[in-house]
């Protein structure tokens, strides 16, 4: 390639190189790639398919371009869509740092950005640009650069009135422009030419960031850039209101299969959308993907590590095989319809070995599996009515959709989830408080805690849900956790005690409900081996597995630091091995013993009112 002639001094570049005395290269030939876009699309991102395009955000300073672009980038990456944001301020610190704000420099600024965006799009990325780009001709040129390369280009006008932009004025630029300290400032003494026919207009003065992002995502879905299933919208399986009467009439006439309480809990999990994108109990293909890969693979890599299955006896199979649909009956009531059922063999030993890593018959959930029928039934589930347990706790059983709305109503910009099946002590609280503090330090303004106890089946020696909820309420009442930034809700899933395999399920379910961060601690979903008494799973593996698990890309894992009772400080504190003698590890066994005997724990271990609830629970056992 010919090197341009030397220049006597450094000059700013405009679109017309001749004006600056530059010699153009005349022996440049475009080199065609050996790799096609389709081939490149197969290896870029986690979903496959070429998605290269440019989303060109334009608008006044302060309109919200950077805010929307960064949020859109985060959303797409979290949903397996490769993308990158080119921000105006960032580009002017590097590639375009030799350009000013004259009309000529603005033109060259946009030209360079358009060329770079084209390369990103050609590489298979969704390239998001965030620039004022005030002139129609420059934006049209950017579009032509993409169209000349047969790449989609979407102009998005980020529209906010000038007075709103001035009120925001994060950088103080409007104030300086009004004072005459900045000349040629767009919107003040330099014109902004509004787009005449953009693909999308975002009214950022009336729509929040999430709404704006969803509008752009919908545009990309309409243009086949982003797959519809990439949005992970909650898939509820309740029959729509306008079809409910017909479905109930149908259910009464169908053959029936009786289900037990744990089955009913799984029906609730499916109905409320926790297992999105499942349409019902797993069919054989989904079951095999789950059992062997801990993921669903049709439509992208979606983490789903535990089989959600319905079992049947040989007699049930003989009676129902060949039916196009049958009703599920719980305690004499027809609660759902399973359509297009598929029967396949329930290989119990293989399932247990893969799901739990053991086939120990004394493991409480494995014991249930071994007692179940020899057949599994997959199918499309239609649930007739919302599921209530009438135990005084239904108000806490918020669905993923309801939780998302609640977080929105609270103006949460980050949601961190804490899953638990035990009472909360001050060590747990320390971790939650510290996570909240870290999120504030990272720039989040309104982090919200989802305190999300497991509400399905648990083994006999676990504290029952009703008592745990009383204990959690006492923790909030005493101010150990802030009620203003905490949502307490119940997760309806049964507990399987499957360690690192199950903790992926716990995590991804909270992801569906809108959590961005998930706190994981020592031995999550674990228990002592029923025969040896040792940990069934290595205590640190759950956290390690979560940080590596495929398909958990919309949230960040927050590993526990080990908390113990600091005898000197008389409070729960992060364990320091250099001062081991200052710390005491209070086991669950010792905690239960103290509560059972009505004794008080060490000062600062648990909120007093919360401890009183535990004492009352163990007293109730003695009376029983």
From Swiss-Prot:
Reaction it catalyzes: sulfate + ATP + H(+) = adenosine 5'-phosphosulfate + diphosphate; adenosine 5'-phosphosulfate + ATP = 3'-phosphoadenylyl sulfate + ADP + H(+)
GO biological process annotation, one example: sulfate assimilation
Adenylyl-sulfate kinase: region residues: 1-225
Gene3D superfamilies from the UniProt entry: HUPs (3.40.50.620), P-loop containing nucleotide triphosphate hydrolases (3.40.50.300), Sulfate adenylyltransferase (3.10.400.10)
Tissue expression remark: Expressed in the neonatal brain and in cartilage.
Positions of modified residues (N-acetylmethionine): 1
Enzyme Commission code(s) on record: 2.7.7.4, 2.7.1.25
Keyword Manganese listed: no
Keywords: Acetylation, ATP-binding, Kinase, Multifunctional enzyme, Nucleotide-binding, Nucleotidyltransferase, Transferase
Top-level lineage group: Eukaryota
Annotated positions binding ATP 1: 62-67, 207, 212
InterPro entries named in the record: APS_kinase (IPR002891), ATP-Sase_PUA-like_dom (IPR025980), P-loop_NTPase (IPR027417), PUA-like_sf (IPR015947), Rossmann-like_a/b/a_fold (IPR014729), Sulfurylase_cat_dom (IPR024951), Sulphate_adenylyltransferase (IPR002650)
Main enzyme class: transferase
Pathway info: Sulfur metabolism; sulfate assimilation
GO CC list: cytosol; nucleus; sulfate adenylyltransferase complex (ATP)
Residues found modified as N6-acetyllysine: 12
Residue span of region Sulfate adenylyltransferase: 234-624
Coiled-coil blocks: none
Oligomer and partners: Homodimer.
Function field: Bifunctional enzyme with both ATP sulfurylase and APS kinase activity, which mediates two steps in the sulfate activation pathway. The first step is the transfer of a sulfate group to ATP to yield adenosine 5'-phosphosulfate (APS), and the second step is the transfer of a phosphate group from ATP to APS yielding 3'-phosphoadenylylsulfate (PAPS: activated sulfate donor used by sulfotransferase). In mammals, PAPS is the sole source of sulfate; APS appears to be only an intermediate in the sulfate-activation pathway.
Family to which the UniProt record says this protein belongs: In the N-terminal section; belongs to the APS kinase family. In the C-terminal section; belongs to the sulfate adenylyltransferase family.
Protein name, entry field: Bifunctional 3'-phosphoadenosine 5'-phosphosulfate synthase 1
Species of provenance: Mus musculus (Mouse)
């Amino acid at each position: 390639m010919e090197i341009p002639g030397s220049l006597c001094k450094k000059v700013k570049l405009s679109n017309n190189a001749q004006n600056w005395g530059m010699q153009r290269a005349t022996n440049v030939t475009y080199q065609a790639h050996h790799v096609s876009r389709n081939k490149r699309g197969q290896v870029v991102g986690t979903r496959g398919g070429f998605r290269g395009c440019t989303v060109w955000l334009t608008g006044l300073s302060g309109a919200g371009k950077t805010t929307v672009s960064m949020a859109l980038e985060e959303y797409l990456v979290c949903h397996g869509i490769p993308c990158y944001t080119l921000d105006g301020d960032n580009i002017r610190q590097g590639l375009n740092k030799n350009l000013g704000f004259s009309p000529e420099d603005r033109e060259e600024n946009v030209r360079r950005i358009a060329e770079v965006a084209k390369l990103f799009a050609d590489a298979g990325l969704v390239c998001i640009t965030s620039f004022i780009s005030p002139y129609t001709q420059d934006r049209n040129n950017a579009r032509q650069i993409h169209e000349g390369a047969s790449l989609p280009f979407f102009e998005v006008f980020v529209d906010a009135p000038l007075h709103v932009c001035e009120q925001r004025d994060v950088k103080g630029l409007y104030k300086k422009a009004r004072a005459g300290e900045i000349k040629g400032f767009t919107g003040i003494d330099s014109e902004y030419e509004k787009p005449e026919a953009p693909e999308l207009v975002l009214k950022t003065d009336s729509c929040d960031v999430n709404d704006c992002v969803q509008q752009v995502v919908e545009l990309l879905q309409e243009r086949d850039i982003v797959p519809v299933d990439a949005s992970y919208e909650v898939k509820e399986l309740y029959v729509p209101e306008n079809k409910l009467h017909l479905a109930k009439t149908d259910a009464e006439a169908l053959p029936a299969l009786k289900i037990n309480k744990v089955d009913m809990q799984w029906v609730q999990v499916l109905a409320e959308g926790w297992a999105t994108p499942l349409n019902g109990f797993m069919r054989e293909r989904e079951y095999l993907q789950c059992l062997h890969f801990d993921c669903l693979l049709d439509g992208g890599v979606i983490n789903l590590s535990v089989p959600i299955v319905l079992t049947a006896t040989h007699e049930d199979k003989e009676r129902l095989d060949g039916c196009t649909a049958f009703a599920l009956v719980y305690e004499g009531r027809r609660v759902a319809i399973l359509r297009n059922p598929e029967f396949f063999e329930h290989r119990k030993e293989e399932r247990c070995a893969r799901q739990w890593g053991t086939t120990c018959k004394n493991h409480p959930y494995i014991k249930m599996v071994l007692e179940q029928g020899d057949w599994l039934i997959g199918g499309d589930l239609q649930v007739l009515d919302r599921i209530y347990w009438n135990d005084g706790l239904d108000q806490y059983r918020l669905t993923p959709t309801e939780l998302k709305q609640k977080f929105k109503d609270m103006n949460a910009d980050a949601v961190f989830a804490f899953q638990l099946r035990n009472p909360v002590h001050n060590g747990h609280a320390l971790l939650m408080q510290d996570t909240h503090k870290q999120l504030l330090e990272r720039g989040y303004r309104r982090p919200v805690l989802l305190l999300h106890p497991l509400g399905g089946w648990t083994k006999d020696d676990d504290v029952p849900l009703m008592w745990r909820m009383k204990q959690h309420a006492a923790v909030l009442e005493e101010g150990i956790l802030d009620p203003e930034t905490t949502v307490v809700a119940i997760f309806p899933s049964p507990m399987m005690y499957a360690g690192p395999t199950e903790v992926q399920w716990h995590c991804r379910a909270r992801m569906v409900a809108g959590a961005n961060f998930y706190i994981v601690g020592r031995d999550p979903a674990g228990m002592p081996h029923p025969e040896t008494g040792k940990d069934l799973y290595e205590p640190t593996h759950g956290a390690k597995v979560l940080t590596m698990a495929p398909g958990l890309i919309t949230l960040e894992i927050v590993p526990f630091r080990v908390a113990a009772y600091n005898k000197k400080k008389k409070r729960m504190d992060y364990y320091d091995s250099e001062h081991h003698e200052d710390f005491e590890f209070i086991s669950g066994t010792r905690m239960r013993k103290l509560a059972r005997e009505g004794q008080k724990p060490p000062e600062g271990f648990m909120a007093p009112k919360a401890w009183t609830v535990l004492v009352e629970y163990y007293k109730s056992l003695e009376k029983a």
